[in-house]
Curated annotation (Swiss-Prot):
InterPro entries according to UniProt: ATP-grasp_succ-CoA_synth-type, ATP_grasp_subdomain_1, Succ-CoA_synthase_bsu_CS, SUCC_ACL_C, Succ_CoA_ligase-like_bsu, Succinyl-CoA_synth-like
One Pfam family, short name: ATP-grasp_2
Cofactor binding note: Binds 1 Mg(2+) ion per subunit.
Designated name of the protein: Succinate--CoA ligase [ADP-forming] subunit beta, hydrogenosomal
Length: 407
């Protein structure tokens, strides 16, 4: 149900999303972050309320139904009624790994907790704005079945999920918000507040360059308020130059170090689980290359887009990153020379091969500007580079090379 786009993005923690909500005046309650049991106790006292909800801050959903790897302690969401209890629960969470359906068996390390004011919930709703590849538009996904995983609702009660395709410029207008509120069964004060909050969430989506704004649950309270109780935001990596606050949240310890290294050279790198590595110029061609590898019976080991940076330094760095992945058994370089000349890329590939000292088979397919000059350089290099005549041939040779076949 969520975004089908391959766009690179990163997640932020819930407490960080609450700060962004505050920036756009989205109603999200009182929220304080703590990184030690003592800070949790102090946060509880500062809230000056008879009770609070304490939540583990990790990059995953399903925290309430999770468990802690080291101790078996249940749940990453607890209700506490005193500062001492807040400290006790924080101690169970901090420094431990929370395992949920979304984390895998090793779980995720919790380094912070968030204390929030309890909300007297009348109904839990689901609300998300995301980019939809099928319609090539932003869409809203809304449901009266909030507080549970939306995939489960889609599987068992698809009729309870409503999809609204938005105008990319106008977004959630008052009219659209009223339509959504009606579908969610909001009435009276809750209806009016729902219309306002949905428009604020659209402004947040656009203003923060988000690729996904998911609120689950979006709570209708007993007194008619509409509150963003739990939220998950994703942001387009390409917006880093104008979203300084948001990208300042980025925890580099949670990011693959090779992705960080690639960024320094203007490369777009996403690790995958296969054994045929790709080094391509252009995101569209990179996707097509991965498809060809799959069609040939293989699995891509990465998405690596040189973009317009197909220089010797960029190619060398790409090879360096790829060659350090032990699961890579072959590399496929697929270049279409437009602005970038094939002879320049060929020279870069040859120099990079020698500098890195590649130990795995290398398949190269060149097409476009100065392609014959590029192919000549590769032929005369004396290196064991496997040339491919077309995209299909390249994919087949790369998969065979990964299996140990000789050419």
């Amino acid at each position: 149900m969520l975004s089908s786009s391959f766009a690179r993005n990163f997640n932020i923690l819930e407490w960080q999303s609450k700060e962004i909500c505050a920036k756009y005046n989205v109603a999200a309650g009182i929220n304080l972050v703590a990184r030690s049991p003592e800070e949790a106790a102090e946060a509880f006292r500062k809230m000056n309320l008879p009770a609070a909800v304490i939540k583990a801050q990790v990059y995953c959903g399903g925290r309430g139904k999770g468990h802690w790897l080291e101790t078996g302690f249940k749940s990453g969401v607890h209700f506490v009624k005193s500062a001492d209890e807040a400290a006790k629960i924080a101690k169970e969470m901090l420094g431990h790994h929370l395992v949920t359906k979304q984390t895998g068996k090793d779980g995720l390390l919790c380094q912070a907790v968030m204390l929030s004011d309890p909300v007297e919930v009348k109904r839990e709703l689901y609300f998300a704005i995301l980019l939809d590849r099928q319609t090539q538009s932003p869409v809203v996904i809304a449901s009266t079945e909030g507080g549970v995983e939306i995939e489960e609702v889609a599987a068992h009660h698809p009729e309870k999920i409503h999809k609204f395709v938005l105008d990319g410029v106008e977004g959630i207008t008052e009219e659209v918000a009223k339509n959504i509120s009606t579908k969610l069964g909001l009435t009276g004060k809750a209806y009016d507040n729902g219309v306002v909050e949905m428009q604020k969430l659209w402004k947040l989506f656009v203003g923060s360059d988000a690729t996904q704004v998911e609120v689950n649950p979006l709570a209708e309270t007993t007194d008619g308020r509409i509150i963003t109780v739990d939220s998950k935001f994703n942001f387009d990596d390409s917006a880093h130059y104008r979203q300084k606050q948001i990208f300042g949240y980025r925890d580099l310890k949670q990011v693959n170090p090779f992705e960080i290294r690639a960024e320094k050279y203007g490369l777009n790198y996403v690790p995958l689980d296969g054994n045929v590595a790709c080094l391509v110029n252009g995101a569209g061609l990179a996707m097509a290359t991965m498809d060809v590898i799959k069609l040939a019976g293989g699995d891509p080991a990465n998405f690596l887009d040189l973009g317009g940076a197909a220089s010797e330094a960029a190619v060398t760095e790409g090879f360096t990153i790829i060659s350090q992945q032990s699961h890579v058994k072959a590399i496929l370089v697929n270049i279409f020379g437009g602005i970038v000349r094939c002879d320049m890329v060929a020279a870069g590939v040859i120099a990079a091969f020698k500098k890195v000292g590649l130990k795995v088979p290398l398949v190269v397919r060149l097409e476009g500007t100065n392609v014959e000059a590029g192919k000549k350089l590769i032929r005369e290099s004396g290196l064991p580079i496997i040339s491919a005549d077309n995209l299909t041939d390249a994919g087949e040779k790369a998969v065979k090379a990964a299996k140990g076949e000789k050419f």
